[in-house]
C-alpha cells in the first residue's frame, strides 16, 4: 500500500 500525491491509498 502506497500513498500518492493526492493522499489516495493505492494497492499494488
From Swiss-Prot:
Its EC number is 3.2.1.-. Not glycosylated. GO terms for molecular function: hydrolase activity, acting on glycosyl bonds. The keyword Disulfide bond applies. It is an enzyme of class 3 (hydrolase). Keywords: Allergen, Disulfide bond, Glycosidase, Hydrolase. Monomer. On the 2D-gel the determined pI of this protein is: 4.4. Has weak beta-1,3-glucanase activity with laminarin as substrate. Belongs to the thaumatin family. This is Thaumatin-like protein 1a. It comes from Manilkara zapota.
Amino acid at each position: 500500500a502506497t500513498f500518492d500525491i493526492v493522499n489516495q491509498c493505492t494497492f499494488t
